[in-house]
């Protein structure tokens, strides 16, 4: 087996990528989330494939086909709950993975980081379109609200929104194309994930100290495979607990009502993992400004490598930057809370302050803190 692992063309690729891959000795549990995201993607593709066998992408039958899956298909309720909650788990792992990248300076590997941002956009698009498919009230009105942002784009906006709609409003054509895109995008995500890994293996993994570790590496298997197995077991425990005991904990009750274009829900909001971006969108009174802020809330991550002013890669020995990082995390929690609240005082003002603080921390405070810390250390 050892000889085949190192000689067979396909086995050799797997060997170099996962088995004999040199890894830094000192990486912590925060480095587990890459493999956990991969596991979430596999679960989502597998459960999604089984759901697609019974789902019908038609406005008249979409809602009843989801009901049919839950009531009549063998273990359909389980597959549907796994798929719906798997998305939440996916985003929890994604956000923790990005947070680790910011904290430990992994953004300095520019190619890997930029592919990661592209992956985030693709996963967000996939999740948004998936939320539309059950054709409940929040599915329909969520699609309507987000699609109505597109006309704000100068010149091409009105044509773009009609092209996405496939008509003059969110209707059958919209649902059909959203289903087609939702089906194909996870495979594009899987391909991009391989490119992400390819770039990562060009430079090697980062480590908590943020310094080169070429002289002190160990093979990925068996050391890190067993370490990651612990993360997998813990995550599966949390996942199955939610799926089997609290399947509707992270969903919206409005989505159990069939879509009705004549009845607007009192409060339209996306899934919890988009609420921070939704809060930033709502905090700007101008439509185009809101759309720009929404895109920049994610795209600002691409500026991290250029805003890095410190001579140290990681935040491990940078207390001022650590403090600012945790303020940023707190700010994101506040934005998530505000995104789920109605548009009325005092939530409007809190959302605007939190949105300004979000960009201020990333664009101003982080670079300034890096310079101050270097000055204190006389570097």
UniProtKB/Swiss-Prot annotation:
It is found in: Mitochondrion inner membrane. Its cofactor is heme b. Binds 2 heme b groups non-covalently. Its main location: mitochondrion. InterPro entries: Cyt_b/b6_C, Cyt_b/b6_C_sf, Cyt_b/b6_N, Cytb/b6-like_sf, Cytochrome_b, Cytochrome_b_C_euk/bac, Cytochrome_b_N_euk/bac, Di-haem_cyt_TM. Gene3D superfamilies: Cytochrome Bc1 Complex, Chain C. GO terms for molecular function: metal ion binding; ubiquinol-cytochrome-c reductase activity. Heme b b562 binds at residues 83, 182. It is a multi-pass membrane protein. Heme b b566 binds at residues 97, 196. Belongs to the cytochrome b family. This is Cytochrome b. It comes from Heteromys gaumeri.
